[in-house]
Amino acid sequence: MSNDFDTIIKNIIKDSPAGELEEVYQDLITIAGENSKETIIDAIAEYNVENSIPIDVDGKDVIISKYNKQGTKFVDPVNGIQFSVDHLHQKGLDVEEYSADIDADQKKAITDLGNYLSTNFPGRATFAVLPLEEQSKTAIIIVSTKYNPSNFWNGHWKSEYVYDKTEGKLSGTIDIDVHYYEDGNVKFHSSKLVEETNIKDPVASIKELEHKFEQDLQESFTDLNEKQFKSLRRRLPITRARVNWGKAIGNYRLGRDAAQGK
């Protein structure tokens, strides 16, 4: 396949709505043919890693990311395993034992995150605590997905941080993607950069940051609905008369103008 084709496929996959990768894959195969399968699967693999998609590994959700990728496999230091991935079906394969050193602070973060997710995130929620090569640094990832295709919407929350214990610094991003597609096609994305200093308890700080982010989102939704959208609506006179829709719409001035292209 040409480089241009590869780029187009990657861009389409990159913009795929949360929870709809298999549908996008089938559509691309229909359009581009079976010969494009390898290119599409490679793009899906990049998508899964970039979005820290949870993979089903023997019935457990395990996040994959750039932080726990080792060669062609991924490691889960918390559960002590390493595995390959079927990226299309998001399944773990060839599971093997894996040992990693997890210090006391990281163990505390694992416990605290488990409690935080169980009381604050709906749907399918999981997290990862990943020791990095620099011993003072730990990657913390939270992913919550809620897919409801029967009601035409899917949602994906990802927050990703790196905590430097020596510097007391927490940096990362919070990302939300929602797709609503009943009688329309609306895709919502919100992202926030995080950079905090003098942090001693990373999970406590994450709770505060994410609670504030959620509050700000709610306020922006309220403002959008009650102010911005209302200003877009055209004010029409109230006639208190029932409009006869259908062919009779041509009897009204608005209908005649529309029919005549005015």
From Swiss-Prot:
Pfam families registered for this protein in UniProt: F-actin_cap_A
Cellular component, GO annotation: actin cortical patch; cellular bud tip; F-actin capping protein complex; incipient cellular bud site; mitotic actomyosin contractile ring
Gene3D superfamilies in UniProt: F-actin capping protein, alpha subunit, F-actin capping protein, beta subunit
InterPro entries in the cross-refs: CapZ_alpha, CapZ_alpha/beta, CapZ_alpha/beta_2, CapZ_alpha_1, F-actin_cap_asu_CS
Swiss-Prot/TrEMBL keywords: Actin capping, Actin-binding
PROSITE patterns assigned: F_ACTIN_CAPPING_A_1, F_ACTIN_CAPPING_A_2
Gene Ontology biological process terms, A to Z: actin cytoskeleton organization; barbed-end actin filament capping
MF (Gene Ontology): actin filament binding
Superkingdom, natural source: Eukaryota
Recorded family membership: Belongs to the F-actin-capping protein alpha subunit family.
Function: F-actin-capping proteins bind in a Ca(2+)-independent manner to the fast growing ends of actin filaments (barbed end) thereby blocking the exchange of subunits at these ends. Unlike other capping proteins (such as gelsolin and severin), these proteins do not sever actin filaments.
PANTHER family, A to Z: F-ACTIN-CAPPING PROTEIN SUBUNIT ALPHA
Quaternary state and interactors: Heterodimer of an alpha and a beta subunit.
Name of the protein this chain belongs to: F-actin-capping protein subunit alpha
Native source species: Candida glabrata (strain ATCC 2001 / BCRC 20586 / JCM 3761 / NBRC 0622 / NRRL Y-65 / CBS 138) (Yeast)
